[in-house]
């Protein structure tokens, strides 16, 4: 029997440090399953240091709308006048090959996916330690105007109101501690008996053989 993949959805308000945590955690060699980040498509402009095909697939609105019309997205949403979406083929291929997939999406995308998948899926919401710290991080990024930051703070409150829809919560006050908590959750999910009894079926059957 083949082990199917696991889907991990991680959401957080902008400025919480979610992307840094995700890119760091998937490099961990502690996992028992191959763990990969699903690369989302977006119509927004690349930020400094971002790489096409690593952080996002940066595409035009025309191409994104074409993909919507062709029903190519597993989920998609409009955030601050930019589209973000996850391609169906990307998720289906990785799940069918037994990969532990990490999705960096908002609560709207999480709702869409949970309405379609009920097995082998779990969700994590990352919170800032305070409103003041969240605002400070947004200002330190130096990417947005005062008006946009005010809008992002308002959006953050709306996003945080959906925390009860998630299975786990992590507070990103200290990065290393938050990273440890994220690793622990992901590893625990991989070690569930539903997955391990398939992964180690041969070993378990051998251990249960009567001595001759």
Swiss-Prot record:
Stretches assigned to the Guanylate kinase-like domain: 5-187
GO MF annotation list: ATP binding; guanylate kinase activity
Subcellular location: Cytoplasm
Superkingdom of the organism of origin: Bacteria
Residues engaged in binding ATP: 12-19
Enzyme's top EC category: transferase
Major location (coarse): cytoplasm
Stored Pfam families: Guanylate_kin
E.C. number: 2.7.4.8
Coiled coil spans: none
InterPro entries in the cross-refs: GK/Ca_channel_bsu, Guanylate_kin-like_dom, Guanylate_kinase, Guanylate_kinase_CS, P-loop_NTPase
UniProt catalytic activity: GMP + ATP = GDP + ADP
Cytoplasm found in the keyword field: yes
GO cellular component: cytosol
UniProt keywords, alphabetically: ATP-binding, Cytoplasm, Kinase, Nucleotide-binding, Transferase
Sequence similarity: Belongs to the guanylate kinase family.
PANTHER family hit by this protein: GUANYLATE KINASE (PTHR23117:SF13), GUANYLATE KINASE-RELATED (PTHR23117)
Biological role: Essential for recycling GMP and indirectly, cGMP.
HAMAP family on file: Guanylate_kinase
Record-given protein name: Guanylate kinase
Species of the source: Blochmanniella pennsylvanica (strain BPEN)
């Amino acid at each position: 029997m083949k082990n199917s993949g696991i889907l991990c959805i991680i959401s957080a308000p902008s400025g919480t440090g979610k992307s840094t945590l995700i890119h760091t955690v998937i490099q961990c060699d502690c996992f028992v399953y191959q763990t990969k980040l699903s690369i989302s498509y977006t119509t927004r402009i690349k930020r400094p240091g971002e790489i096409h095909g690593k952080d996002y697939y940066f595409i035009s609105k025309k191409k994104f709308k074409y993909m919507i019309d062709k029903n190519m997205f597993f989920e998609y949403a409009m955030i601050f006048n930019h589209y973000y979406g996850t391609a169906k083929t990307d998720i289906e291929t990785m799940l069918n090959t037994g990969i532990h997939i990490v999705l960096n999406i908002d609560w709207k995308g999480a709702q869409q996916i949970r309405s379609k998948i009920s097995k082998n899926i779990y969700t994590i919401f990352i919170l800032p330690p305070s409103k003041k710290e969240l605002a400070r991080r947004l200002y330190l990024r130096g990417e947005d105007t005062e008006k946009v930051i005010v809008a992002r703070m308002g959006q953050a409150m709306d996003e945080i109101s959906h925390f009860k829809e998630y299975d786990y919560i992590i507070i990103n006050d200290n990065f290393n501690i938050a990273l440890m908590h994220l690793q622990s959750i992901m590893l625990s999910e991989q070690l569930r008996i539903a997955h391990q009894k398939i992964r180690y079926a041969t070993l378990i059957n051998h251990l249960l053989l009567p001595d001759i």
